[in-house]
């Protein structure tokens, strides 16, 4: 039996000891940007990418901190590489001026540009990928002006698969994971196996080394779905690393991923962040409350916040969520790298692994908010009360005696709730989340 992460693990473990530190602070804080995939899949072209870049400015998202405009899969000629140079060839029907032409226009707007490849022979959509061509592709990306690489895990040949299987309790790998364990896993690794020596780690390290060898700083986003215990080596390889299979704009999938990622917060700090996948805010049939909870949890976990909706048709409510100043301020804290941690599970006993009901009570210190970030989440399917008790919150409990009061601000509305004694109770609609800044004592 393998356990995803010890459910009694202390959330005070050191992280970042072997972090990938890049010039100019690139990758020190979790990325903010936009990506083509969730909105358009393979149906991409220069016009859609440039429209997103322009709307990032027009809608105030650039001013809010979003800076990367990322091109996902399907940007190249599908038939193969240039027979002479061995370079990947941008699809001229989609990108008449090449990737470099799009990158130049995005840079002229004061933004950065990202590209996609995979650590295999083909991308997930069947386009040429980078395994064995890491140096050539890194050089191409640098010459084109690329600032960000999302590196997927498709097209892996059999000689590059891992000897052992790591437990990732995600629905893409089955459905039976009692409290975060994988009792049915085939070929588990021996105790104390060093996953940094695995074939998966070697494939991703090869591209890391290629990127480090070019004369351009390129943020490196690993997309290998939590395999090969990436949490133990991802911070020395890339700036973020995916922890699960792909997200979808379905509430059940969003809370499943939130649950999985919540057990990995000890790995998040400056220069390295577990990545629960791109945002679905504005997509599918998610309610306003679900969009709000999705964003708040991702921001509190200091996940990369990569928008995945069409910006030229986004509504004001969804845009306001993506631009929420207090949550973005917490997310981009230049002094405190650690994310918010769950301090009470609420619906379940503490440390319960439940894909439908993640931890409901979160808190985190902040140097930018003038207090502690506190989240209360209703994971249930009907309206429920949730109560934040000051003496239960780790950042407050040493000073929160009976009768203690704190000045509290509600994050979604900006309302000053005044001096709140002992606790704060709120009724939340199904799947909604309350977000507070608990400030000075009063």
Curated annotation (Swiss-Prot):
SUPFAM superfamilies recorded: (Trans)glycosidases, Glycosyl hydrolase domain
Gene3D superfamilies xref list:
Aldolase class I, Golgi alpha-mannosidase II
Q: What is its EC number?
A: 3.2.1.22
Disulfide bonding pattern of the chain: 42-74, 124-154
Recorded GO molecular functions are: alpha-galactosidase activity
Q: Where along this sequence does the record place binding of substrate?
A: 224-228
Coiled coil ranges (UniProt) are none
Chaperone as a keyword of this entry, yes or no, is no
Q: Where is the signal peptide?
A: 1-19
**Reactions performed catalytically:** Hydrolysis of terminal, non-reducing alpha-D-galactose residues in alpha-D-galactosides, including galactose oligosaccharides, galactomannans and galactolipids
Keywords of the record, alphabetical order, are: Disulfide bond, Glycoprotein, Glycosidase, Hydrolase, Secreted, Signal
Tell me the InterPro entries matching this sequence.
Aldolase_TIM, Glyco_hydro_27, Glyco_hydro_27/36_CS, Glyco_hydro_b, Glycoside_hydrolase_SF, Melibiase_C
Q: Which residues are glycosylated?
A: 159, 173, 179, 215, 235, 285
- Spans traversing the lipid bilayer: none
Query: Which residues does the entry assign to the active site, renumbered to this chain?
Result: 152, 246
Q: Does the keyword Transferase apply?
A: no
Purpose: Hydrolyzes a variety of simple alpha-D-galactoside as well as more complex molecules such as oligosaccharides and polysaccharides.
Similarity remark: Belongs to the glycosyl hydrolase 27 family.
Protein name, UniProt field:
Probable alpha-galactosidase B
Q: Which organism is it from?
A: Aspergillus oryzae (strain ATCC 42149 / RIB 40) (Yellow koji mold)
Q: What is the lineage of its organism?
A: Eukaryota, Fungi, Dikarya, Ascomycota, Pezizomycotina
């Amino acid at each position: 039996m393998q356990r995803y992460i010890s459910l009694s693990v202390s959330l005070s473990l050191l992280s970042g000891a072997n972090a990938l530190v890049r010039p100019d602070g690139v990758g020190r804080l979790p990325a903010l940007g936009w990506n083509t995939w969730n909105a358009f899949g393979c149906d991409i072209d220069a016009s859609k990418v440039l429209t997103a870049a322009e709307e990032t400015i027009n809608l105030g998202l650039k001013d809010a901190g979003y800076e990367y405009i990322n091109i996902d899969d399907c940007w190249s000629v599908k038939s193969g590489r240039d027979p002479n140079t061995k370079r990947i060839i941008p699809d001229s029907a989609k990108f008449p001026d090449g990737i470099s032409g799009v990158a130049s226009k995005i840079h002229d707007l004061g933004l950065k540009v990202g590209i996609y490849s995979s650590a295999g022979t083909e991308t997930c959509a069947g386009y040429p990928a980078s395994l064995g061509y890491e140096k050539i592709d890194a050089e191409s990306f640098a010459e084109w002006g690329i600032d960000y690489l999302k590196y997927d895990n498709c097209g892996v040949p059999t000689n590059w698969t891992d000897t052992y299987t790591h437990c990732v309790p995600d629905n893409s790998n089955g459905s039976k994971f009692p409290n975060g364990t994988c009792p049915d896993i085939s070929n588990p690794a021996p105790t104390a196996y060093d996953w940094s020596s695995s074939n998966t780690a070697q494939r991703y390290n090869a591209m890391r080394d290629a990127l480090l060898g070019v004369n351009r700083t390129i943020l490196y986003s690993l997309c290998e779905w939590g395999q090969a215990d990436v949490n133990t080596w991802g911070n020395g390889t890339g700036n973020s690393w995916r922890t699960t299979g792909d997200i979808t704009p379905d509430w059940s999938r969003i809370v499943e991923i939130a649950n999985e990622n919540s057990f990995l917060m000890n790995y998040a700090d400056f220069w390295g962040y577990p990545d629960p996948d791109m945002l679905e805010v504005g997509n599918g049939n998610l309610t306003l409350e679900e969009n709000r909870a999705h964003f708040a949890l991702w921001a509190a976990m200091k996940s990369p916040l990569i928008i995945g909706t069409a910006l030229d048709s986004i509504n004001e409510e969804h845009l306001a969520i993506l631009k929420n100043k207090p949550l973005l301020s917490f997310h981009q804290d230049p002094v405190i790298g650690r994310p918010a941690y769950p301090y009470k599970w609420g619906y379940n006993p503490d440390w319960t692994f439940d894909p439908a009901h993640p931890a409901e009570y979160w808190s985190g210190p902040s140097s930018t908010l003038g207090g502690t970030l506190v989240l209360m989440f209703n994971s249930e399917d009907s309206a429920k009360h949730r109560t934040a008790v000051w003496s239960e919150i780790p950042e407050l409990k040493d000073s929160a005696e009976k009768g203690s009061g704190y000045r509290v601000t509600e994050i979604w509305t900006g309302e000053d709730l005044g001096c709140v004694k002992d606790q704060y109770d709120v009724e939340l609609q199904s799947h909604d989340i309350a977000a507070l800044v608990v400030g000075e004592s009063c």
